[in-house]
């Protein structure tokens, strides 16, 4: 999460003050978020970094993100090297160099997880990554510095 947060702050050219605030908030995320026991933990880390950043730079976009209506995951994240490694490691075969078409397919899968967690209200279970319906609540809790279970 720290590498992704660093790249996001560079991508948005945050001022030194905002970088320090962002880094401090990222560091205040409970350590249980970064244990990566399940694939859900990876997605929590990814989405928490986005929520905290949007809280600093664009509150209306953060609101859209939390409602599942943002294009942030599809448009901004693929520009970042840390995200590319994340996607290729979690969804792909672990190879850091995959074809562009495979990378796009992997990114679409992350967008599906985002939509499942933040937009959909159904009780269905996202089987591919064993993601619970409480993913959104866990992300919000972690981004506010609270532990989630």
What does each model-identified segment do?
Residues 2-149:
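The feature marks long, low-complexity, polar/acidic/proline-rich intrinsically disordered regions embedded
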């Amino acid at each position: 999460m720290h590498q992704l947060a660093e790249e996001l702050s560079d991508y948005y050219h945050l001022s030194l003050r905002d970088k320090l605030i962002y880094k401090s908030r990222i560091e205040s995320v409970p350590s249980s978020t970064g244990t990566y026991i399940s694939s859900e933990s990876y997605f929590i880390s990814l989405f928490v970094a986005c929520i905290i950043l949007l809280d600093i730079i664009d509150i209306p976009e953060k609101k859209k993100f939390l409602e599942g209506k943002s294009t942030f995951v599809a448009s901004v994240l693929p520009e970042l090297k840390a995200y590319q490694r994340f996607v290729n490691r979690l969804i792909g075969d672990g190879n850091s160099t995959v074809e562009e078409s495979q990378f796009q397919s992997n990114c679409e899968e992350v967008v599906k997880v985002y939509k499942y967690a933040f937009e959909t209200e159904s009780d269905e279970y996202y089987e591919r990554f064993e993601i619970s319906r409480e993913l959104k609540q866990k992300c919000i809790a972690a981004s506010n510095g609270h532990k989630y279970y």
